[in-house]
């Protein structure tokens, strides 16, 4: 797949309940980010859009759309790898998942395996520039 290599998992009670990865190109859908895909899968699995008690792990800091969806889905914690200084909205540019003004209450922490996550993204974009 020729997608930006971002992946997300959602965990509840110590178990992975959903996974997602970017599928924008594959689905011709600008909303098919890893976080959105994982949120949709978790909601289906739990039979509830409220993802209270869940933690999301994602390789790249969520964008504004994904950060808003995280807030609206009531995920408790977001842990991400690489920071996105340009578009990140879970700490870099804003912190929407934690902002009560948009329904957020999540704790956000970035930098988990940030070098590895950033390297995967950097390699992908270097390859794309050569094509």
Regions found by a protein language model. Give the residues of each.
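Zinc-dependent deaminase
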Residues: 1, 65-131
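Short, basic and Ser/Thr-rich N-terminal targeting/leader segments
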Residues: 2-6, 52
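Short beta-strand scaffold segments in enzyme catalytic cores
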Residues: 6-14
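A short, polar/charged loop-to-alpha-helix boundary motif
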Residues: 26-36
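Glycine-rich oxoanion-binding loops at beta->alpha junctions
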Residues: 36-43
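Immediate flanking context of iron-sulfur cluster ligation sites
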Residues: 48-60
């Amino acid at each position: 797949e020729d997608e930006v290599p971002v992946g997300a998992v959602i965990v509840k009670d110590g178990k992975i309940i959903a996974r997602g990865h970017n599928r924008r190109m594959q689905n011709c859908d600008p909303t098919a980010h890893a976080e959105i895909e994982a949120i949709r899968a978790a909601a289906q699995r739990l039979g509830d859009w409220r993802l209270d008690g869940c933690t999301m792990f994602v390789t790249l800091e969520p964008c504004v759309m994904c950060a808003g969806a995280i807030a609206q889905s009531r995920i408790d914690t977001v842990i991400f790898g690489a920071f996105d200084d340009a578009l990140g909205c879970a700490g870099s540019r804003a912190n929407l998942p934690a902002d009560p003004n948009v329904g957020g209450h999540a704790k956000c922490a970035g930098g988990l395996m940030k070098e590895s996550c950033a390297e995967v993204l950097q390699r992908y974009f270097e390859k794309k520039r050569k094509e």
